[in-house]
Amino acid sequence: MEMKNVKGTKDYLPEEQVLRNKIKRACEDTFERYGCKPLETPTLNMYELMSYKYGGGDEILKEIYTLQDQGKRNLALRYDLTIPFAKVVAMNPNIRLPFKRYEIGKVFRDGPIKQGRFREFIQCDVDIVGVESVMAEAELMSMAFELFRTLNLEVTIQYNNRKLLNGILESINIPTERTSDVILSLDKIEKIGIDGVRKDVLERGISEEMADTICNTVLSCLKLTIADFKEAFNNPLVADGVNELQQLQQYLIALGINENAIFNPFLARGLTMYTGTVYEIFLKDGSITSSIGSGGRYDNIIGAFRGDNMNYPTVGISFGLDVIYTALSQKETISSTADVFIIPLGTELQCLQIAQQLRSTTSLKVELELAGRKLKRALNYANKENIPYVLIIGEDELSTETVVLRNMKEGSEVKVPLSSLKDNTFNNYCNIPIKL
């Protein structure tokens, strides 16, 4: 049997997983700093649930992995974390609102494979239900900038409002039943250009006259400010969208993030579930051209699930861990899983105790040489694993109550008191922050 992975999946070896775990921890820490609560939902769902928001959207539906269980029920692997979250809120009416949750988990899409995009991947999501104000969007965008600062990645966020976009299309007499097709085409404008949009809408069955109107409208809007759209399009949806965008912009200015938040009147986020603000996050350096995060407001999904068709104001943001990993792996040296490597020289019993002492009294990550390798080979291992410090402990060291501390980066050695490993003064001899 040939050993290979399913197309679009990948094994992550320890040196890769270290960085992926760092990203996950950064997400968790940032999300919790904003008062978000953790949630976990099933990977396996009813197909009817997972296909709900994509009704009529064949481009999305064809990417859902489907299967049947032994009871002949139609099931699906979750395509994202948004619908499972909406299901949880709909099933638990006693959840206190506003409810801010985060979830980090695997999702599956049978779509094209490209840089940073696989068919099995991890999303890191935050959603807020119960807040009508675009202050929620501003906070999520602020959180995104904070997360990427933590990861030393410079990003911009493009944003728009679906009310504005839908109002523009309504004002140029695009039939309601064709709006989704046009939006899906406009969503690609930065990738395929205006000529590509024209070709795409024609392929979707839009008439040439309507295609020309769409393209001319796009060109006429490119230099408009947010406020200009009210005058350019006498439409109530446009007016509502402008009002929400202006309020959001005020919050972004107050937060000091408006400079890196860019209004894009044709950003669409193709999914039909969005009802207001939408946004996408991009790397400033363009090393990855696709978005590394996205989201928006969807006020109708939970009410539809609950069957009362009430408005449950909800807004979310999603970060792709895998694409962030790709960006970081291009610029960051993989760090070690251990801070200190202990090499016993005939002192295995004592070193076992010392390793346990350090783990139990400090936050140091400690690895002990277990394979009985000679000193040279053990040091070579520590060097290849990027472990910053090595403790060399032989019988001579124990007799003088000292140990040898080797700085692997500098190649220097110093003798430190054995007592420092027991009284928490070890950090005086190295540059590793120790939490007691």
Curated annotation (Swiss-Prot):
Compartment(s): Cytoplasm
Predominant location category: cytoplasm
InterPro entries, alphabetized: aa-tRNA-synth_II, aa-tRNA-synth_II/BPL/LPL, Anticodon-bd, Anticodon-bd_dom_sf, His-tRNA-ligase, HisRS-like_core, HisRS/HisZ, HisRS_anticodon
Keywords tagged on the record: Aminoacyl-tRNA synthetase, ATP-binding, Cytoplasm, Ligase, Nucleotide-binding, Protein biosynthesis
Top-level taxon in the UniProt lineage: Bacteria
Reaction equation(s) it catalyzes: tRNA(His) + L-histidine + ATP = L-histidyl-tRNA(His) + AMP + diphosphate + H(+)
GO cellular component, one term: cytoplasm
Enzyme Commission designation: 6.1.1.21
One GO MF term: transferase activity
Keyword Oxidoreductase: no
Annotated PROSITE patterns: AA_TRNA_LIGASE_II
GO BP term, pick one: histidyl-tRNA aminoacylation
Keyword Protein biosynthesis: yes
NCBIfam families: hisS (TIGR00442), PRK12420.1 (NF009085)
Quaternary organization: Homodimer.
Family affiliation: Belongs to the class-II aminoacyl-tRNA synthetase family.
Protein name per Swiss-Prot or TrEMBL: Histidine--tRNA ligase 1
Source species taxonomy: Bacteria, Bacillati, Bacillota, Bacilli, Bacillales
